[in-house]
């Protein structure tokens, strides 16, 4: 029987560890994201590691004077006319919830590939990188949430994001507090 001191415990793997590992691989040239997928270098050139299924979705929402955008874990877009006390809301009166997203985009989001998110409010832009997941449900009719963690529920559209509502610029937060501001959110997997 093996001595228990010789057995290594499995490390607890966090979403941050996975994200930093892939960033390190990319920085070292050990993985490359190109048209069609993620590639690894081999003796004969680049080999496809994972095919990227592309998809794109645009969502339109609006600012609101009660938007505070202070959540440290996520940001949320809602069809509601005003935030209901959530500090994650960045846009209200959205034209779509997760359930309304087009089928091509939903299929692409479920491949665990990188998602590029652009939020435009007036002349201010925020860019976020996150990931899809085969576990995404995309069933909520009212909300869309992008999370820094790997938690998934019916309103989650992306996980392991590099930015939460709290990390948006002061200029963006100011623009989001104006009810006249049209907020354009683009979700793209390419």
Annotate each PLM feature:
Residues 1-10:
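Short acidic, hydrophobic short linear motifs in intrinsically disordered regions
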Residues 26-36:
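A short, conserved structural fragment
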Residues 36-53:
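Short, cationic-aromatic polyanion-contact patches
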Residues 54-60, 66, 70, 118-127, ...:
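Eukaryotic, polar/proline-rich low-complexity intrinsically disordered regions
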Residues 58, 82-133:
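Acidic (E/D-rich), amphipathic helical modules within compact regulatory domains
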Residues 84, 125-173:
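Short, solvent-exposed interaction modules
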